[in-house]
A protein has these predicted regions:
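Terminal, non-catalytic protein-protein interaction segments that mediate quaternary/complex assembly
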Residues: 2-189
């Protein structure tokens, strides 16, 4: 597991409870997800987003107990290494898609092209710059976003560090909250 404070990986014992491409009948998180999909399709609530038609349901909440294993879908093949690389990229507070590309991760490619950035009137038109997305909000919430090449060390609120500290020192706190969304930054994303 990645240790944020030491900025290195540490070996921990993780029990994986999934099979790629095979449905696991004891996977409660997957059952919850699939039931949600059935409900959304049955209700047929279609919205038009900026990219396509989307089936949606407002205000849905799903809860996963990580002691039961990582809630990875087993009804379809999931790129496990890609998921981990993207997560580590978020944990590091990165916003430069070229870092992911160097690791053969292409999830964000369409959102970082020059054409996309220009279509959104984004001023930091460095190709590959994704703006103040999830990882930036986790590690530098409230900092003024300039571009993906700027050093944001000790700028903004490090929500991830705060949440980890609270879990360790005050686990019953109702203030253990981390948000990936800062309303002020949404137009820059």
């Amino acid at each position: 597991m990645y240790n944020v404070e030491k900025k290195q990986y540490e070996k921990i014992d993780i029990k994986y409870k999934f099979l790629l491409g095979v449905q696991n009948k004891n996977n409660n998180s997957e059952k919850e997800y699939l039931n949600l999909l059935k409900t959304i399709i049955k209700e047929n609530n279609i919205k038009i987003s900026r990219n396509s038609k989307v089936y949606s349901k407002f205000g849905v909440r799903m809860e996963f107990n990580l002691l039961d294993g990582f809630p990875l879908l087993t009804t379809k093949k999931m790129p496990w290494k890609t998921i981990l690389r993207e997560l580590i990229w978020f944990i590091n507070g990165e916003t430069d898609n070229k870092i992911l590309n160097n690791k053969k991760v292409h999830i964000w490619d369409l959102n970082s092209t020059k054409e996309f950035l220009e279509s959104r009137n984004l001023s930091y038109e460095i190709e590959g710059d994704l703006g103040p997305i999830y990882g930036f909000q986790w590690r530098h919430c409230g900092a003024e976003y300039i571009d993906c090449d700027t050093d944001y060390k000790n700028k903004g609120v490090d929500q991830l560090k705060y949440v980890i500290n609270e879990i360790k020192t005050n686990p019953s706190s109702r203030r253990i909250i981390m948000s990936s969304w800062n309303p002020i930054d949404i137009p820059k994303m």
